[in-house]
Amino acid sequence: MFTPFEAFGIKFRNQILAPPTKENLANHRGIVTGEMIRHYSALAKQGVGTMLTESAFVARQGKMAAGQLGISEEEHLEGLEKLVKAIKKEGACIGIKLSHAGARTSEEVCGENPVGPSLYNFGRDFDLSREFDEGDIEEIILHFVHAAERAQEVGFDFIEINGGDQLLLDQCFSVRFNNRDDDYGSETIENRLRLTCQIIQAIRDRKSVSIPISYYFSIFDKMEDGFSITNLHETLELLEKSGVDIFHPFAVHVMNRCFDSEESLLELIGLNTERPLVADGNIKSPQVLLEVLNIDKVGWYVLEKTLLARPNWFNFLKKKVADQEK
């Protein structure tokens, strides 16, 4: 876990991944600031192997908050390249999380009427979205493709598509937010994942893009609406076929049992894919970390937010794990 390894032709100094944060330290146009670079550099300096940025909007219409990081325009490239160089100077690798807010934004923030799979309003600070049409779908796919190109151009080691956090792709995947009756509707898992898979496939088909693709998602809220273990198997199969390289499932606690089985979500996914996994969910003690070590196919371990609050926690954890492994 704390030793160097190689994956996808990339050399990582260890398997620890610093969690993405929603610091919103970019300027009002989404451009990287000096404060943002200092924030991420301080985390990388602790010794983690990989940094993952907060969600970066792939299009202005997909911006979810003021100060959110952007990767939608050429003007974002210079700052992003400075961020990448600063992190790599500290010895860590870095990925960027690509997102589109969908209905979870407002006209004040994104500059237009929010767009989502169906009409929806997330509450007082948001606006009622309009339903995306075929033209919107084509544009959204291109936004993600161009963002992937920019990420590779400035030197990011991988991208992560955000399929969680109740953002656009999660909205499509959830029957709570998606009540369409067309090919992108909620009737089947394939339909609910159609936009996601089209985005990933389009990135894969782009000859100028060879960057590894991680996919971030959560299913526990869907389980309340009838999502089953069979649905999970179908989800993994569809995502693999589209071109996902890494699965990053999120759970409130990484070892919580899933589908009334004896296994956690991470374990179930590991049994049904050959792709490497990211272990994420309340890993904030040596005991939990050692427990997760026994799960097959885990490539990265996301340290909990304690890493942000206690500057020396990484070295403390490293020593504790080493002591308990003796």
Which sequence ranges carry the predicted segments?
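Flavin-dependent oxidoreductase catalytic cores
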Residues: M1-K326
